[in-house]
């Protein structure tokens, strides 16, 4: 409910032409069995993004989401066994996990005037791995 409530409370304060960018995940399209609850919540966020894009279009407020694939963060080694940490991201066509800095340009672009006609988009940043 947090994202929905945040949007509900912030939209009246936003100027027309604003931008909302959610962070979903490639797990929203193709969930991994051992983290189904995570995939389900990210799927809900992706659908909320698309729905809000339609509802807020009349105010010229754009709503998009970034769907990261495997991205290396300090939390990765804390939550995985050693073998999983070593192979993390190796299943992508690029053969490695992404770095947080590699996501930055997606958010900057979606927040900028360059994306003034982009709304309802789920932008996948995943090293070439395409969720179905």
Features from the language model and the residues they span:
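Active-site helix of classical SDR
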Residues: 7, 41, 49
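A conserved structural motif in NAD(P)-dependent oxidoreductases
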Residues: 92-103, 114
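Short, flexible catalytic-loop segment of classical short-chain dehydrogenase/reductase
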Residues: 29, 67-78
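Active-site loop immediately N-terminal to the catalytic Tyr-X3-Lys motif
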Residues: 17, 30-36, 58-59, 95, ...
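Alpha-helical segment proximal to the catalytic Tyr-Lys
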Residues: 12-13, 54-58, 116
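Conserved SDR Rossmann-fold cofactor-binding beta-strand/turn motif
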Residues: 62-72, 111, 124-126
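Residue(s) in the substrate-gating loop at a strand-loop-helix junction
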Residues: 25
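Short C-terminal tail/terminal secondary-structure segment
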Residues: 30, 107-108, 119-132
